[in-house]
Design a protein with these regions (language model features):
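Glycine- and aromatic-enriched membrane alpha-helices
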Residues: 1-246
Length: 246
């Protein structure tokens, strides 16, 4: 988010009137939904190793794999239905982001939530990722090309809060969430952790991006952006290296 704000939107993303007010928001699609889907499923597969590292026994590993499967699956289906109803057709690109949003959302509580909690996480993640992308794009006019803020920031916060709300004492971690015990202690701890991470990350990334901007530069030139970084950075005739002449 800090980087997107400091770097500014891509050329042609926002069309402004003479008064400088945004009058049109242009969609700049990616190169290939097919390759995007492949990358999404590679990440999903790898997430079992990522979350599975929290296990300390076979039974806890099974529980973690269950929650890690349910949340992204439910998030994907939720976004499919939500965008279908809202726009008249499902948004495949947004559904791929929803899969990742569900994975991000369940990471904090992969060993603390049960199947029911995973479903709740997935439903909220599927709606949240769409809402955040649209707010950034249409309301705040912050250009986030891959929807990283909606996937990682928003759902990282949601997933961390979900532990305080939905943690089941019978799950492997044995934590007590507000829904099951009525106690708000865990929710308070999670909220404090979120606040600390947000402040630290915002401050550190602002400094890092300022240093980059004042030294090697944070953004490529307009000419390089128009030609495309596949050409200017990598010397490729297009984004698809397989189609380049030998």
């Amino acid at each position: 988010l800090i980087g997107a704000i400091m770097e500014g939107p891509r050329l042609g993303k926002y069309i402004k009137d003479k008064a400088g007010k945004v009058k049109k928001v242009n969609a700049i699609p990616g190169h290939s939904i097919t390759l995007g889907a492949l990358g999404c499923f590679i990440l999903w597969f790898g997430w079992y190793g990522f979350n599975g590292a929290a296990a300390w026994s076979g039974s806890s590993l099974a529980s973690i794999f269950l929650t890690t499967t349910i949340a992204p699956a439910v998030a994907t289906c939720t976004t499919l239905i939500y965008t279908w109803v809202k726009n008249g057709k499902p948004d495949v690109s947004m559904c791929l982001n929803a899969s990742l949003a569900g994975l991000v959302g369940i990471t904090a509580g992969c060993d603390a939530l049960d199947a029911f909690g995973s479903i709740i996480v997935g439903v909220v993640s599927g709606i949240l990722v769409v809402a955040v992308v649209e707010i950034l794009d249409l309301k705040l006019h912050i250009d986030d090309p891959v929807g990283a803020v909606g996937v990682h920031l928003a759902n990282g916060v949601w997933g961390t809060l979900a532990v305080g709300l939905l943690a089941n004492p019978q799950a492997p971690a044995g934590l007590e969430g507000l829904l099951y015990t009525g106690g708000a202690k865990l929710l308070g701890v999670q909220s404090l952790g979120i606040a600390a991470i947000l402040v630290w990350t915002a401050a550190l990334m602002t400094i890092v991006f300022l240093i980059i901007d004042k030294t090697i530069g944070l953004r490529v030139s307009a000419e390089e952006e128009i030609r495309g970084l596949d050409s200017t950075e990598h010397g490729l005739p297009s984004a698809y290296a397989d189609f380049a002449p030998a």
